Structures are given as structure tokens and as C-alpha cells.
Amino acid sequence: MIGFKEETLHFDVVIVGGGMTGLCAAIASARHGAKTALVQDRPVLGGNASSEIRMHICGATANMKKPELSEGGIVHELMLSNKRVNDSYNFSIWDAVLFQAAKNEKNLTLLLNTTMHAATCQDGEITCIECYQMSTEKRLLIHGKIFADCTGNGTLGYYAGAAFRAGSEPHSEFHEPHAPEKANNERMGNTILMRAINMGHPVPFTAPAFAKHLTEKQLA
């Protein structure tokens, strides 16, 4: 069996996770002169805001309830770039805007289709992560002085041995208004963003065999 090709890389800053947080962190790091790597396990940037999920950025405007407000900083730059070339709000074009923003930074190395699966620590600090890049079939050993976990799931922290918790904390711990009275193991499920078009007439639909059928009572 032929083994994977192996490549060792060295950076000042290594950011794992190419969603909006990771992308903005990588751009900021590169602009400050640090040799930066952005490790993203998908073929596109943006995370939930990419064409793969299509959750548009609406934090500052509260989903357009406050249209006079706007995102700031690098996110604002990206949204202005998108407005300039993407009047149709096509999410595939938005993907290209984010990709170009990363490629514009000479200090930033973009590693797409690259999945981290191990981390090495020394004296309580991460020194190296091990990744597999699907598109090149390479095993990458990425060394860095600073690592940032922008995975959205704390994956880097987990591989580094950091303490973690899952589920919902009780209301008494942090006094969050919607927290349950007792702690539980419930977590957010899969996020499905549907897109519907009014065809103007009934359209037949046959649900697949694996679909779960919900009653009106369950939906109430």
C-alpha cells in the first residue's frame, strides 16, 4: 500500500475553521504581518454563511429589524465587496468574494479541504496539528506559535486535551433567561435551511421512506 505524502509547514499563527470568525481572524492576523495559515475542512469559506448552508449575516440588523445598523470591521468590508459584484445575492458568488478576500492577503496561506485530526502539545501549549488534505491526499504537519480554534465545535481544544462540557447548563449557574431549571444533555440538532417557491398551484410530493412524519399535535 502506498502511503500518503507528508509535508511539514511552519507559521506564526494557525487558525482552524474557515467560517466567518476564522476567516476574519486570519485576514486580521495576516494584515498585522504574521505568517498565517487558515485550515478549513470544506471546499468553501464562510461556514454557515457559505453556499453550503446559506445563512446570511444578520447579527447587527437583527434580521433587518434594525436596518439602520451594520456589521463593522472586516465583515463590513466583505459585505461591501459582495454588494459591488453580487446584486442578485447569489451565494456561489458570495463564496468567491470570501475566497478572493483570503487570497488577497500575501501573508495568508489558505488550506481548503483540510481536516485536522490530531494536535501535539508541549508544556500546556499546542505546537503542531496533524491534518489530512483530501484534494491532494497529503498528510500535513502544521507547526505554529499561536493556534486559534474557530471550528465552531471546539474541535482543536478537544484534540489538545482541553476541558469541555456538552449539553445545557442549569439556569442557576449562569442565569441565562432560557436555560432549563435542571442541567441536561440536549444539544442543537442539524440545521436545515429550506427554500420554497410559490408555484401558484398544488405540487405533488412523495416523502422519502426515511422521512419522519409529524402530526399537527406534535408541531403545535
How would you label these PLM feature ranges?
Residues 120-141:
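Conserved beta-strand-loop-beta-strand element in the redox core of flavoprotein oxidoreductases
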Residues 9-11, 136-146:
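Core beta-strand elements of the Rossmann-like FAD/NAD(P) dinucleotide-binding domain
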Residues 18, 133, 151, 160:
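Glycine-rich, N-terminal phosphate-binding loop of Rossmann-like dinucleotide-binding domains
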Residues 7-19:
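Beta1/beta-strand and adjacent pyrophosphate-binding region of the FAD-binding site
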Residues 22:
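N-terminal Rossmann-fold NAD(P) dinucleotide-binding loop
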Residues 2, 28, 34-35, 40-125, ...:
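Conserved N-terminal/central alpha/beta ligand/cofactor-binding core
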Residues 16, 142-152:
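Short hydrophobic core segments
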Residues 158-220:
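Rossmann-like dinucleotide-binding core of oxidoreductases
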